[in-house]
Amino acid sequence: MLENLIKDFKEIFKYSGEVERFFSPGRVNLIGEHTDYNGGFVFPCALDFGTYAVVKKREDKTFKMYSKNFENLGIIEFNLDNLIYDKKDDWANYPKGVIKTFLDRNYKIDSGFDVLFFGNIPNGAGLSSSASIEVLTAVILKDLFKLDVDIIEMVKMCQVAENKFIGVNSGIMDQFAVGMGKKDNAILLDCNTLKYEYVPVKLVNMSIVIANTNKKRGLADSKYNERRTSCEEAVKVLNNNEVNIKYLGELTVTEFEKVKHYITDEEQLKRATHAVTENERAKIAVEFLKKDDIAEFGKLMNKSHTSLRDDYEVTGLELDSLVEAAWEEKGTVGSRMTGAGFGGCTVSIVENDYVDSFIKNVGKKYKEKTGLEASFYIANIGDGAGKVK
């Protein structure tokens, strides 16, 4: 595939010399949802599909960007001296935001580059196509301009780009998983301290199956920011009653039970309940995984979905239909929505002998309930972003 992309790059940019190649994965979160911005634990892994880039450094200050996923937009061009959010630049605002964030932190970027992107992550599926292109851009900048910057710092700058430049209040999980991914491992990440641990995911005769609702959704204008605000308000209420925390993720379920009566707003209470219980589920689930107890891990995935449905209310008809159909299937170890919600994807662990029937039956039931066709992917856990030799 890379050979074809190089060929396309040379045709589009009318160039015949040497080029650089990079890859950045998508990610799926196995458990610990909407906990990252609540200072809690998440458990994502990088996928073996993602975003590819073919790049050539330029002598001037122009950036020329082309995406095989948005060919109708042609080459999007902007200048190093004028890095502002521009709606007409569409997807290219993501790399642009990363470049600006690097410059704002005084990293020396003195010229532009030509780049061809191609992603085989479905856009809007909640598998972090945006974090993938952000971290990919950071890796390109480090390599082309020989920058002295470590991957964790790059990940943080990508989150800043998404928060400040794009305007989505996302936590650090997506960029961290994309940048720090490790083959056959998921990452237990404490989003408050950024302490992390690689945990091998040993699925014997089982697969991770991702199902895409194919429901259109926009993260920036969805109810994502509302949920975050509710949790922040709950923290304020607790602090006014001398609980003294920065994030809900600092409370155990037992501690929360003792103080939750202070939160009188019903909606805030439900949101806070999810944040605290999901954080505990993530920690317990990882302990089961370390003992190779996939059955218990799966049960906690199911409980996670129920909490996201009932307390956090971020699922909706499409995600619930996929998950409930999955729960009815023989061979399903666990199934839940993954990502921000309101559409996007589910993640399931399914016994290999039943994967074909799972895809067929869940797809059929989903179409009957929603009128939409779901897409299914068997996910392999891959490495984080880097240069391709």
UniProtKB/Swiss-Prot annotation:
GO MF annotations, alphabetized: ATP binding; galactokinase activity; magnesium ion binding
Pathway as given in its UniProt record: Carbohydrate metabolism; galactose metabolism
Positions of ATP binding: S67, G124, A125, G126, L127, S128, S129, S130
EC main group: transferase
Reaction(s) catalysed by this chain's protein: alpha-D-galactose + ATP = alpha-D-galactose 1-phosphate + ADP + H(+)
Binding site for substrate: E33, H34, T35, D36, Y224
Keywords, ordered alphabetically: ATP-binding, Carbohydrate metabolism, Cytoplasm, Galactose metabolism, Kinase, Magnesium, Metal-binding, Nucleotide-binding, Transferase
Cellular compartment(s): Cytoplasm
EC number of this enzyme: 2.7.1.6
Function per UniProt: Catalyzes the transfer of the gamma-phosphate of ATP to D-galactose to form alpha-D-galactose-1-phosphate (Gal-1-P).
Protein name: Galactokinase
Annotated gene: galK
